[in-house]
């Protein structure tokens, strides 16, 4: 999971279906419990105590997280790397796209970042579809997969 030290805290944000909220006490345990084989396949082992920028909620149900960070040597000035994960029961419903779009709106309004990036494994079809749906453009390949970017 990523952290964004020195970044403005995300305020509660919603599109009427998906809501992003800052993590609360107890959320980290629920985020760890929500991991499955896909989590480990695409994201690796993950943090023991995850602290994302925001938790993703649908109604009263915690369904995943979104995050971003700026601490990669391959990022250009003004760029951030975005990450996300939804629990299995929340997939294939459009929630990930909605959550990432809300995060991009936060980045646009509350930070000086101008470009969001995604690094996606070539075999991660759902994330490749999300990148296309949200207007990310492939900028090439990196060791971990394909590299996408879009303005925020």
Residue ranges with predicted function:
Residues 41-50, 57:
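A short, aromatic/hydrophobic, helix- or strand-capping loop or linear motif
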Residues 1-38, 53-152:
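Acyl-donor (CoA/ACP) binding surface of acyl/acetyltransferases
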